[in-house]
Amino acid sequence: MLNTLIVGASGYAGAELVSYVNRHPHMTITALTVSAQSNDAGKLISDLHPQLKGIVDLPLQPMSDVRDFSADVDVVFLATAHEVSHDLAPQFLQAGCVVFDLSGAFRVNDRAFYEKYYGFTHQYPELLEQAVYGLAEWNADKLNTANLIAVPGCYPTAAQLSLKPLIDGGLLDLTQWPVINATSGVSGAGRKAAISNSFCEVSLQPYGVFTHRHQPEIAAHLGAEVIFTPHLGNFPRGILETITCRLKAGVTHAQVADVLQKAYGDKPLVRLYDKGVPALKNVVGLPFCDIGFAVQGEHLIVVATEDNLLKGAAAQAVQCANIRFGFAETQSLI
């Protein structure tokens, strides 16, 4: 059994991790922690997330010193803020733990990226070099031996799963940048209360236009520029992305279908649509990314859906852990 610590367990993604790890036959939860200053310290996880009542009733322990929790721990999931993960990951790695970081602290191997988009100076360039980007369907060979796994962002997961096989397969005319219009549920903003996330304020609106940190994350890992516009939707969870691309001259519907099938035909957590396009309701609460598309002449529209808290966060983290330790890829997920 892998002794597993979940840091930042009080949040939405943290609670999903608790659920997955609790039912994993090869993992056992050693502790659930929050920051020492958290108002949730000392509370039961099931008091904050009643869906866990009678299933996981562990307390949220305040953590001020990593050494109090790292002894005999094999796996650490960091469901923490970017700056917090930046500081904690090196300490857990030094203690011999395998770290799965759900924040953006190690996703892009470029220190300037963090100063520009995250507002802090990255102190661990050697870890940026070592970190494996956990886009599970594409990086399994590197995940096998990784000790620091940077779980991709929610928007980048759906965008890259949609575009990577098309770009790698040479089907797109990249002189016209792919345009990604993405809408996420309010849970993507986290559990902390804010006026902008309140029931009466949320409608449907774009944000981070030309400035969102997920645009350079997507572009860096695709090796191609994209235009990315996120939107906040008036629903709790889920992401839907509509991606508009130009195909190279002569590329057919059948070629697009073939490239996607070759990429994901044996990947259990990506579901391809032979006809039509996905709807959000079919992935909420599930660990899948659903992908469908339509072609008209040289124009391609790809639609991808996922649960932002699952395939966009907790489920992908556990999927990466399964790959890392040689378990069935979908263990505890489906």
Curated annotation (Swiss-Prot):
Query: Which residue pairs form cystines in this protein?
Result: none
> Does the record carry Amino-acid biosynthesis as a key word?
yes
Superkingdom is: Bacteria
Quote the InterPro entries the UniProt record gives: AGPR_AS (IPR023013), AGPR_type-1 (IPR000706), NAD(P)-bd_dom_sf (IPR036291), NAGSA_dehydrogenase (IPR050085), Semialdehyde_DH_NAD-bd (IPR000534)
Which reaction is recorded as catalysed by this protein?
Answer: N-acetyl-L-glutamate 5-semialdehyde + phosphate + NADP(+) = N-acetyl-L-glutamyl 5-phosphate + NADPH + H(+)
Q: Name one GO cellular component term.
A: cytoplasm
Listed A to Z, the keywords are: Amino-acid biosynthesis, Arginine biosynthesis, Cytoplasm, NADP, Oxidoreductase
> Which terms under GO biological process does the entry name?
L-arginine biosynthetic process
Q: Which GO terms describe its molecular function?
A: N-acetyl-gamma-glutamyl-phosphate reductase activity; NAD binding; NADP+ binding
Location comes to: Cytoplasm
State which Enzyme Commission number(s) the record gives: 1.2.1.38
Q: In which pathway does it act?
A: Amino-acid biosynthesis; L-arginine biosynthesis; N(2)-acetyl-L-ornithine from L-glutamate: step 3/4
NADP: present as a keyword of the record? Answer: yes
* NCBIfam families from the UniProt entry: argC
Q: Which family does it belong to?
A: Belongs to the NAGSA dehydrogenase family. Type 1 subfamily.
Could you tell me what this protein is called? N-acetyl-gamma-glutamyl-phosphate reductase
Recorded source organism is Salmonella paratyphi A (strain ATCC 9150 / SARB42)
- The gene designation is argC
